[in-house]
């Protein structure tokens, strides 16, 4: 019986240490690395970086603002507000005009918008756990969209190693506020890269 208690104690201690290390920010006052376009190189060879392009569209900024508002609702564990903002994001995505982009960019943007719209619709109809599952994929879509449209704002790609094997999202603030765990683990994550 004593051996079982010691084993359970050791397992609990190991789990606590893993959780603590995994969620540690790791930021030692080092500035975030500037993000160039490496992660989109295979699809965006004609782009030098994610800075604002000639194809900048005000509606792309509206989509970003809706995304950030949705992120903030998830950070605040506000299911009702997230539903409302998911619906608002659906409308912004549907009104996005791709006509000023090259044929290749139009094709990519149409795919991104279709996928992002589906996830925003799920968010507008779901409980918070399901909203967060769809926000993970929505975040990838929005990041891919920014690689094409550019942005006027400085953005931070943040990363939580704990949620679903590791998950990234975009933020306007360098300070990490985790939309996947909300108040449960608000500060879990780190700035992975700086955009623009």
Q: Over which residues does each language-model region extend?
A:
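Mature extracytoplasmic or organellar-lumen-exposed domains after removal of signal/transit peptides
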Residues: 54-196
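Post-signal peptide N-terminal segment of mature Sec-exported envelope proteins
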Residues: 32-55
